[in-house]
């Protein structure tokens, strides 16, 4: 049989859905997957067929969606979001994944996307293709039975609560407006298209033999969606909490801690979530899980580095940056902006493309990556400046998986 890589036709999608069902334990089914297809640009998908002509088997697939990602400086970038990547178990170790990624990266570059992004099913796969983990998922579990808010925590007065308990499907417009405010100011924020709002709210309904009904807590500047765990009836899981002010964040947590029928509240958040410091006993907010979130590949180094903002406090400095398989660039940072141009000058900082992806949003420090020899420079002062320049004054978060 001849293995061929090409764009899928409509006849390929049933085979793609079969491969998805066999590959992804969380496959959402053909109906929902068809809705996600509306986010895929023309020529944004590839398949590998074993055989030629009608009836040939789909043994590999990958696609990208047209997304909008917020980066430091409240800048929103067109972003290619890779997803639906799978290789049949009958065709592993034949280079199919590499071939599909190479072809998609060519198309993404030709379309002018400065960055590509994905959520990795396994942590050891995508670094070789230039992707680096750029956000961190951090689960906190609070024993609410003993939780008390610090006297300094916002909203500690005797006035009425600014939070309402509501049904999610009845307040979509308010959720959308709050989320839109949130995603435009937070590095890692993603525009959520209408089809994904449809899916999110559909998932809030109870499923026979599956998840329980979700409820919502609504504040003028934030919301939280939560449901009781499927098997542990004393655990409430917060599936999404978005707050655009510290007051809203604390008010939502006061309401969650008020779920008296629960023993524990869990949330997948980010490492800089202030929740533990709202409590008199910080140990009650335990870290129960941690993993990489969004991964980034810098497709166009000058365009990406010139697009984001940088810390003003650093002052002006210049260096020469070499990115393996990406080029060598004169980088000048000053007044919160960067100028990046190709150069033949000797490199002062060296790193692989995946390392630049990890640095880009500001969640990971240059000095940490240098300590692991993933970033290399002989100038310690330059490293400190790079550290400070790439830091984000707004904590980096993960919007949603795709």
UniProtKB/Swiss-Prot annotation:
<dbReference type="GO" id="GO:0097691">
    <property type="term" value="C:bacterial extracellular vesicle"/>
</dbReference>
<dbReference type="Pfam" id="PF13527">
    <property type="entry name" value="Acetyltransf_9"/>
</dbReference>
<protein>
    <recommendedName>
        <fullName>N-acetyltransferase Eis</fullName>
        <ecNumber>2.3.1.-</ecNumber>
    </recommendedName>
</protein>
<dbReference type="InterPro" id="IPR022902">
    <property type="entry name" value="NAcTrfase_Eis"/>
</dbReference>
<dbReference type="InterPro" id="IPR036527">
    <property type="entry name" value="SCP2_sterol-bd_dom_sf"/>
</dbReference>
<dbReference type="GO" id="GO:0051701">
    <property type="term" value="P:biological process involved in interaction with host"/>
</dbReference>
<dbReference type="GO" id="GO:0052040">
    <property type="term" value="P:symbiont-mediated perturbation of host programmed cell death"/>
</dbReference>
<dbReference type="GO" id="GO:0044161">
    <property type="term" value="C:host cell cytoplasmic vesicle"/>
</dbReference>
<comment type="function">
    <text>Can also acetylate multiple amine groups of many aminoglycoside (AG) antibiotics, leading to their inactivation, and thus contributes to drug resistance. Is also able to acetylate and deactivate the cyclic peptide antibiotic capreomycin, but not the other anti-tuberculous drugs isoniazid and pyrazinamide. Acetylates kanamycin (KAN) more efficiently than amikacin (AMK), even though Eis seems to bind AMK with higher affinity. Does not acetylate and inactivate streptomycin, apramycin and spectinomycin.</text>
</comment>
<keyword id="KW-0046">Antibiotic resistance</keyword>
<keyword id="KW-1036">Host cytoplasmic vesicle</keyword>
<dbReference type="InterPro" id="IPR051554">
    <property type="entry name" value="Acetyltransferase_Eis"/>
</dbReference>
<feature type="active site" description="Proton donor">
    <location>
        <position position="126"/>
    </location>
</feature>
<dbReference type="InterPro" id="IPR016181">
    <property type="entry name" value="Acyl_CoA_acyltransferase"/>
</dbReference>
<dbReference type="GO" id="GO:0052041">
    <property type="term" value="P:symbiont-mediated suppression of host programmed cell death"/>
</dbReference>
<dbReference type="InterPro" id="IPR041380">
    <property type="entry name" value="Acetyltransf_17"/>
</dbReference>
<dbReference type="GO" id="GO:0043655">
    <property type="term" value="C:host extracellular space"/>
</dbReference>
<feature type="binding site">
    <location>
        <begin position="85"/>
        <end position="87"/>
    </location>
    <ligand>
        <name>acetyl-CoA</name>
    </ligand>
</feature>
<dbReference type="Pfam" id="PF17668">
    <property type="entry name" value="Acetyltransf_17"/>
</dbReference>
<dbReference type="GO" id="GO:0061733">
    <property type="term" value="F:protein-lysine-acetyltransferase activity"/>
</dbReference>
<comment type="subunit">
    <text>Homohexamer; trimer of dimers.</text>
</comment>
<dbReference type="Pfam" id="PF13530">
    <property type="entry name" value="SCP2_2"/>
</dbReference>
<feature type="binding site">
    <location>
        <begin position="121"/>
        <end position="122"/>
    </location>
    <ligand>
        <name>acetyl-CoA</name>
    </ligand>
</feature>
<feature type="active site" description="Proton acceptor; via carboxylate">
    <location>
        <position position="402"/>
    </location>
</feature>
<dbReference type="InterPro" id="IPR025559">
    <property type="entry name" value="Eis_dom"/>
</dbReference>
<feature type="domain" description="N-acetyltransferase">
    <location>
        <begin position="3"/>
        <end position="154"/>
    </location>
</feature>
<dbReference type="GO" id="GO:0042802">
    <property type="term" value="F:identical protein binding"/>
</dbReference>
<keyword id="KW-0964">Secreted</keyword>
<dbReference type="InterPro" id="IPR000182">
    <property type="entry name" value="GNAT_dom"/>
</dbReference>
<keyword id="KW-0808">Transferase</keyword>
<dbReference type="GO" id="GO:0030649">
    <property type="term" value="P:aminoglycoside antibiotic catabolic process"/>
</dbReference>
<dbReference type="GO" id="GO:0008080">
    <property type="term" value="F:N-acetyltransferase activity"/>
</dbReference>
<dbReference type="GO" id="GO:0034069">
    <property type="term" value="F:aminoglycoside N-acetyltransferase activity"/>
</dbReference>
<comment type="function">
    <text>Effector that is released into the host cell and affects host immune responses; it negatively modulates inflammation, macrophage autophagy, and cell death through redox-dependent signaling. Acts as an acetyltransferase. Acetylates 'Lys-55' of dual-specificity protein phosphatase 16 (DUSP16)/mitogen-activated protein kinase phosphatase-7 (MKP-7), a JNK-specific phosphatase; this leads to the inhibition of JNK-dependent autophagy, phagosome maturation, and ROS (reactive oxygen species) generation for enhanced intracellular survival of M.tuberculosis.</text>
</comment>
<comment type="similarity">
    <text>Belongs to the acetyltransferase Eis family.</text>
</comment>
<dbReference type="GO" id="GO:0052032">
    <property type="term" value="P:symbiont-mediated perturbation of host inflammatory response"/>
</dbReference>
<dbReference type="GO" id="GO:0052167">
    <property type="term" value="P:symbiont-mediated perturbation of host innate immune response"/>
</dbReference>
<dbReference type="GO" id="GO:0046677">
    <property type="term" value="P:response to antibiotic"/>
</dbReference>
<keyword id="KW-0012">Acyltransferase</keyword>
<dbReference type="GO" id="GO:0005829">
    <property type="term" value="C:cytosol"/>
</dbReference>
<feature type="binding site">
    <location>
        <begin position="93"/>
        <end position="98"/>
    </location>
    <ligand>
        <name>acetyl-CoA</name>
    </ligand>
</feature>
<dbReference type="GO" id="GO:0033661">
    <property type="term" value="P:effector-mediated defense to host-produced reactive oxygen species"/>
</dbReference>
């Amino acid at each position: 049989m001849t293995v061929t890589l090409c764009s899928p036709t409509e006849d390929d999608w049933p085979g793609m859905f079969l491969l998805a069902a066999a590959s992804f334990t969380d496959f959402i089914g053909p109906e929902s997957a068809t809705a996600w297809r509306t986010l895929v640009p023309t020529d944004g998908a590839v398949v590998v067929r074993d055989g030629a002509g009608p009836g040939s088997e789909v043994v590999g697939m990958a696609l990208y969606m047209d997304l909008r990602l917020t980066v430091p400086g409240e800048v929103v970038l067109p972003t290619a979001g890779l997803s639906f990547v799978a290789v049949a178990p009958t065709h592993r170790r034949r280079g199919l994944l590499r071939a599909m990624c190479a072809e998609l990266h060519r198309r993404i570059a030709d379309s002018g996307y400065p960055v590509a992004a994905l959520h990795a099913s396994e942590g050891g796969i995508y670094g070789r293709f230039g992707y680096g983990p750029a956000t961190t998922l951090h689960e906190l579990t609070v024993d609410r039975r003993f939780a008390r808010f610090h006297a300094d925590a916002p909203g500690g007065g005797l006035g009425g609560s600014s939070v309402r308990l509501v049904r999610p499907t009845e307040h979509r417009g308010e959720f959308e407006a709050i989320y839109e405010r949130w995603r435009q100011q937070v590095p890692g924020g993603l525009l959520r298209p209408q089809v994904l709002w449809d899916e999110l709210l559909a998932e809030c309904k109870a499923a026979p033999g599956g998840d329980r009904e979700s409820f919502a807590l609504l504040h003028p500047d934030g919301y939280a969606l939560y449901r009781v765990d499927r098997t542990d009836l004393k655990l409430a899981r917060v599936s999404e909490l978005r707050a655009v002010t510290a007051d809203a964040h604390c008010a939502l947590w006061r309401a969650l801690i008020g779920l008296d029928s629960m023993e524990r509240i869990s949330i997948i958040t980010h490492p800089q979530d202030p929740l533990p410091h709202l409590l008199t006993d910080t140990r009650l907010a335990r870290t129960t899980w941690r993993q990489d979130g969004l991964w980034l590949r810098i497709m166009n180094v000058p365009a990406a580095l010139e697009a984001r903002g940088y810390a003003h406090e650093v002052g002006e400095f210049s260096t020469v940056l070499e990115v393996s398989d990406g080029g060598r660039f004169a980088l000048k940072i000053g007044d919160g902006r960067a100028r990046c141009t190709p150069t033949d000058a000797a490199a002062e900082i060296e790193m692989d493309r995946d390392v630049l992806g990890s640095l880009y949003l500001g969640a990971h420090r240059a000095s940490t990556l240098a300590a692991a020899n993933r970033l290399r420079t002989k100038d310690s002062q330059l490293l400190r400046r790079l550290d400070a320049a790439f830091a984000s004054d707004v904590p980096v978060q993960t919007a949603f998986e795709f």
